[in-house]
A protein has these predicted regions:
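Conserved N-terminal alpha-helix of the aminotransferase class I/II PLP-enzyme fold
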Residues: 1-28
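Conserved PLP-enzyme active-site core in the AAT-like
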Residues: 16-19, 29-204
Length: 204
């Protein structure tokens, strides 16, 4: 996607979302999540993540050969839904798996539950790990007051944002946001592995 119009659109998106760079994705947030995980992990690497991640995360682990370290969120018995990852759970996983390369967080979960993202980002960075956020249901966090913190505002390294779920765009359109410490060129190479090089301009 070297087209000037697309490059300008990516720059405008990055500015709007407070990211160092934004990539326009046309394979749904599945392709965005997979690119995010494949960027962070190689074969044999460990990644800390909640048990209730989207299947696109698990499929990415199959592709790259990374090893999941699961954190089991508590369940709200009255509502019957999984909650977010507790800080104590994440800290324990980091301590027990100091060689893990990343921590992945749902921000929010399918049911709108958020973890303490700022604290988790700090714990990950203090341990030399990346922090990735699946924000398939959190696009609105970037554009409203009184809402939970967005991944980029919390200092996360990468975030997958589903524009078509909560941003009003056509189905399959998504964004992959990266922070300043992630190599833009390497991410672009990974994206070329996970989505078409002939993206629909209707989706873009």
């Amino acid at each position: 996607m070297k087209n000037f119009c697309i490059r300008e659109a990516e720059e405008l998106a990055a500015d709007a979302f407070g990211a160092a760079h934004a990539f326009l994705m046309v394979g749904g947030t599945t392709s965005s999540v997979q690119s995010m995980v494949l960027t962070a992990c190689k074969r044999g690497d460990e990644i800390i993540l909640p048990r209730n991640v989207h299947r696109s995360v698990l499929n990415a682990l199959v592709l790259c050969g990374a090893v999941p370290v699961y954190v089991n969120p508590e369940v709200d018995k009255r509502l019957g839904i999984s909650l977010g990852m507790k800080r104590e759970q994440v800290a324990k996983a980091i301590k027990e798996h100091p060689n893990a390369v990343a921590v992945l967080v749902n921000n929010p979960t399918y049911y709108g539950i958020c973890s303490d993202l700022r604290a988790i980002v700090k714990m990950a960075h203090d341990a030399g790990m990346l922090c990735l956020a699946d924000e398939a249901h959190g696009t609105h966090f970037y554009f409203g007051g009184g809402l939970p913190v967005s991944a980029m505002a919390a200092g996360a390294d990468m975030a997958s944002v589903s524009m078509h779920k909560s941003g009003g765009s056509l189905t399959q359109s998504s964004l992959l946001l990266i922070g300043p410490n992630v190599h833009q060129g390497y991410v672009r190479q990974i994206i070329n592995l996970t989505q078409t090089t002939s993206g629909s301009y209707l989706l873009i």
